[in-house]
Amino acid sequence: MEHYLSLLVRSIFIENMALSFFLGMCTFLAVSKKVKTSFGLGVAVIVVLTIAIPVNNLVYNLLLKDGAIVDGVDLTFLNFITFIGVIAALVQILEMILDRFFPPLYNALGIFLPLITVNCAIFGGVSFMVQRDYNFVESIVYGFGSGVGWMLAIVALAGIREKMKYSDVPPGLRGLGITFITVGLMALGFMSFSGVQL
């Protein structure tokens, strides 16, 4: 149990997808203007990561890994295309559910919801799962923790950006300029967790 708790804390704070690895920056910067929208996208990313990483773990271990189907048959060259296909299917299902049951959130996310398919945070989480050879339960914990960490970062950035709307920002830094500086300072804050050993 302690191992899983350590993995969860590491994936949220120490190895934060957005602020340690800088993955998923396109949607991270574009959707972080309002806390409500950021929270909705963060929940969507949590759901996709929590499902995509374990499902891809099963696909990798049962089909693609060297010797998984037949001894001597290595299908790992199909990793990327298979993982992207699984992620795309999950995002499509999530998009249909949001459209049906949560139309305001679906409309607020707009084009960024289908972009979760190619969000490098999702694919990065799946790639880290394979690289670190997580088992099925570890991949569930890692997927959930990575999603929570990404959501924590985007909601924090959205809160800061909402407050900065009323600040006296120098004209040359307005818009994305001050946002990049803010993200850099947030990343420095999360870097302080890097020395923590669990």
Curated annotation (Swiss-Prot):
Its main location: membrane. GO terms for molecular function: oxidoreductase activity, acting on NAD(P)H, quinone or similar compound as acceptor. The keyword Lyase does not apply. The keyword rRNA processing does not apply. It is a multi-pass membrane protein. NQR complex catalyzes the reduction of ubiquinone-1 to ubiquinol by two successive reactions, coupled with the transport of Na(+) ions from the cytoplasm to the periplasm. NqrA to NqrE are probably involved in the second step, the conversion of ubisemiquinone to ubiquinol. Belongs to the NqrDE/RnfAE family. This is Na(+)-translocating NADH-quinone reductase subunit E. It comes from Photobacterium profundum (strain SS9).
